[in-house]
Amino acid sequence: MAGIPDEVLIGCIGKIIVATRGVAGPGEVLVRVRGGSETFIAWSAEPVPKGATVLVIESRGHRAVDVSPWTDPLAEFEEDDRR
C-alpha cells in the first residue's frame, strides 16, 4: 500500500469511482491520504452509486476497504453561509 498502514484509511472520506453492488460485488473508491490520492477496492453492505461520498469504516488489507455512504454534517451550514 505504498507505505500507508491499513489503519490510516479508517475514518478517511472517499469518492466512489466504480459503483459498489453491496454483497453482490465490490466497486472502487478514490481516497485522499497523506497529501495524495489512491484507489482501493470498495465493499459495502448496500449498493453505492458512482460519485457518492463514502466513509472508510474498515480495512480488509491488500488494498481493499469497507465503506459506508457519508454526508458531511457541516455541508448544511456551509450552504446556509452562501445564501
Language-model features: locations:
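Terminal membrane-proximal soluble interaction domains of membrane-associated proteins
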Residues: 2-81
